[in-house]
């Protein structure tokens, strides 16, 4: 088994990093450290890891559900955490555990029910889009994980800054300034920096961390010299397109981000207007599967 390399860490400005030191980013779940330790051992103990996962019934159930997802297309269904772990492998299992743990990391998460449902919808549509567009270097589980974590910094800022709800509303509606510039005009940081730090701390892959950090940057999508490698650009384009589909299909909260980033996303995914309309029709049944 190839040992997992430490994810490359997208650079975060030192002043900003210091300014968010007290924002209370949720700690990394212990099970993630235990899985990573096994990934880097010469003889990973899958049964031992499955036993640890089984200590948390909801975690085990979530992992089994992940393994049985149509994203993977396994010929058989997992009936236990050990079977799910064997089918998925340690790398995907580690990301799946992080995704399952994310919502539970925030006390009183019911207050953010609308946010969690939107994130789950974007993640589901992102995984589906990665399959549909057959994007080079991006697996469906990568796109799903990224879609789920992309805006996690928003929840952290909502619980840290009482005024952030209004700042967020202003950023969503601003037609001219970049989303993060609106945040930075009122706060010492923005949700992409905070979300990137959480993703790094939770040992998500470097490309996912970088895509979280730069997902509101048009320049990162289109410039030849960019902080994002091509898989990271594709991740941003996939999730932004997924968000657009969600807004079109549900009439949910509209933002100005598609006007700013949509053309670049469509170029990356080789989508014209007709293709975008077609995937919008095809995506609608998926929303009924989101819990």
Region locations from a protein language model:
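Short, surface-exposed acidic
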Residues: 139-140, 206-209, 268-280
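Short helix/strand-capping connector loops at secondary-structure junctions
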Residues: 256-270
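Terminal targeting/low-complexity segments that flank the catalytic cores of oxidoreductases
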Residues: 1-8, 270-291
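Helix-termination/interfacial motifs at the ends of transmembrane alpha-helices
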Residues: 165-169
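Conserved alpha-helical "signature site"
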Residues: 1-164, 177-258, 285
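GAF sensory/regulatory domain recognition
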Residues: 171-176
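Low-complexity, glycine/alanine/valine/leucine- and proline-rich hydrophobic stretches
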Residues: 230, 240, 266-274
């Amino acid at each position: 088994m190839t040992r997992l390399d430490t994810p490359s860490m997208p650079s975060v400005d030192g002043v900003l990093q210091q300014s968010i030191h007290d924002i209370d980013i949720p700690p990394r779940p212990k099970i993630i450290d235990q899985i990573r330790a096994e990934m880097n051992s010469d003889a990973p103990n899958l049964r031992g890891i499955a036993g640890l996962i089984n200590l948390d019934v909801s975690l085990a159930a979530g992992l089994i559900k992940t393994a049985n997802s149509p994203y993977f297309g396994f010929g058989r269904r997992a009936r236990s955490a050990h079977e799910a772990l064997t089918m998925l492998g340690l790398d995907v299992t580690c990301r799946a555990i992080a995704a399952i743990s994310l919502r539970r990391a925030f006390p009183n998460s019911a207050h953010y029910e609308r946010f969690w449902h939107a994130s789950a919808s974007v993640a589901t549509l992102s995984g589906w889009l990665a399959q549909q567009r057959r994007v080079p270097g991006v697996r469906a589980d990568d796109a799903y994980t990224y879609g789920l974590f992309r805006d996690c910094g928003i929840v952290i800022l909502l619980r840290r800054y009482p005024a952030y709800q209004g700042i967020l509303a202003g950023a969503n509606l601003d037609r001219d300034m970049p989303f993060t510039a609106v945040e930075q005009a009122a706060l010492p940081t923005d949700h992409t920096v905070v979300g990137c730090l959480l993703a790094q701390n939770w040992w998500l892959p470097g490309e996912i961390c970088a895509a979280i950090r730069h997902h509101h940057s048009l320049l990162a999508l289109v410039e030849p010299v960019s902080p994002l490698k091509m898989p990271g650009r594709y991740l941003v384009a996939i999730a932004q397109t997924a968000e657009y589909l969600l807004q079109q299909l549900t009439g949910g909260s509209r933002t100005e981000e598609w006007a700013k980033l949509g053309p670049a996303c469509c170029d990356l995914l080789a989508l014209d207007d007709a293709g975008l309309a077609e995937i919008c029709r095809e995506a609608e049944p998926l929303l009924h599967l989101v819990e």
